[in-house]
A protein has these predicted regions:
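Alpha-helical transmembrane segments with an aromatic anchor "belt"
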Residues: 108-117, 121-163, 176
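Final/C-terminal transmembrane alpha-helix of multipass membrane proteins
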Residues: 263-291
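Juxtamembrane/interface segments at transmembrane-helix termini
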Residues: 69-77, 131-144, 162-175, 213-234, ...
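Membrane-interfacial helical/loop segments at transmembrane boundaries in membrane proteins
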Residues: 75-106, 165-196, 235-252, 293-318
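Alpha-helical transmembrane segments
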Residues: 111-112, 116, 198-216
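Alpha-helical transmembrane segments and their helix-start/interface "positive-inside/aromatic belt" motifs
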Residues: 38-63, 135-156, 203, 263-274
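Cytoplasmic membrane-interface regions of multi-pass membrane proteins
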Residues: 31-44, 77-87, 95-100, 122-148, ...
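N-terminal juxtamembrane cytosolic/stromal segments of multi-pass membrane proteins
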Residues: 1-59, 75, 79-100, 249-253, ...
Length: 318
């Protein structure tokens, strides 16, 4: 007897290409001839295309391309236009925001101006794509849950690169474009403002981050575990609970004492995921504007007694 395992997609059934629901009045059509890719089918739908971009999609990609082009060319210029050095030092290359002396004004190109232009293009690209998700959802008769979830991530992005620098009075507070440079910015941000771990909104954000990962793993594992009973057909299980849903519910009642429903688990996951960047954005926005030192704030409000841990290693160990 074959063992039933479905951690990876092992069976792929290819029917006729799905061209999507009929489109109403539009100046743009779906582009591309559908093709099937076996390796894409390992993780998702094997069909690639056709795709609909429309005006908003094309404009978003254009602004995104300009942002990446500006960032990339500035990084390439910083290594004297050497492709080999660009690849070797790629993780260390950066495009920094203007220094504090320029405040909120437009800085010279080589002193932060390129960062401002790239930031504008990237923000325009993201916002245009966000509007596109709303319009595509409406056109397909869907709810706008994805749009609002995407908006939560955009909120955090705008806090880091625009809202907080605006409140602080200069763009030097913003995050640079670069892999290691933005990690260094994160470390310095926490150090300069007294350890971000004492920020209650950071605590809430991390709780929702870990909670999202836990819920995602629990839900995915549960559905895979009952897919032999048709558990992956969740819409059917929501409106007409079958043996897959009953077995999953019984498992969690036995192991946790409580079970979500086939519908409510998605609400749990949506709220946990959305509240992570929302809480994080609030915490970042309060840092430096309302609270200058989170460690001292934590002492004042009883989060810590202010006594540092003794990390001294004794000269003689027992």
């Amino acid at each position: 007897m074959l063992e039933y395992q479905n951690i990876f997609t092992r069976v792929q059934v290819h029917g006729p290409a799905d061209m999507g629901v009929p489109m109403k009045h539009t100046n743009f059509g779906r582009e591309g001839t559908p093709v099937f890719n076996r390796w894409m089918g390992k993780i998702g739908d094997a069909q690639i295309g056709p795709i609909y971009l429309g005006f908003l999609g094309i404009a978003s990609l254009a602004f995104g391309f300009m942002a990446i082009e500006i960032i990339g060319l500035n990084m390439l210029a910083s290594v004297n236009w050497s492709p080999l050095e660009f690849m070797r030092r790629f993780f260390w290359l950066t495009l920094d925001p203007p220094t504090a002396e320029y405040g909120l004004t437009l800085a010279p190109l080589k002193k932060g101006g390129w960062w401002q232009i790239a930031g504008f293009c990237l923000t325009a690209s993201i916002l245009l794509w966000w509007i596109r998700t709303y319009r595509r959802a409406r056109a397909l008769g869907m709810g706008t849950h994805v749009t609002y979830a995407f908006g939560a991530a955009i909120w955090l992005y705008l806090v880091l690169g625009f809202f907080r620098p605006l409140a602080m009075g200069n763009f030097s507070e913003a995050v640079p474009f670069g892999i290691f440079s933005h990690l260094e910015w994160t470390n310095n941000f926490s150090v300069n403002y007294g350890n971000l771990f004492y920020n209650p909104f950071h605590m809430i954000s991390i709780a929702f981050l870990y909670g999202s990962a836990l819920l995602f793993a629990m839900h995915a594992a549960t559905i895979l575990a009952v897919s032999r009973y048709g558990g992956e057909r969740e819409i059917e299980q929501i409106v007409d609970r079958g043996t897959a849903s009953e077995r999953a519910a019984l498992f969690w009642r036995w192991t946790m004492g409580f079970n979500a429903t086939m519908e409510s688990i998605h609400r749990w996951a949506w709220w946990f995921a959305v509240l992570c960047p929302i809480a994080g954005g609030i915490g970042i926005l309060l840092t430096g504007t309302a609270v200058d030192n989170w460690y001292e704030w934590g002492i004042k409000h009883g989060l810590t007694n202010g006594n540092p841990y003794d990390m001294t290693v004794p000269s003689t160990l027992p």
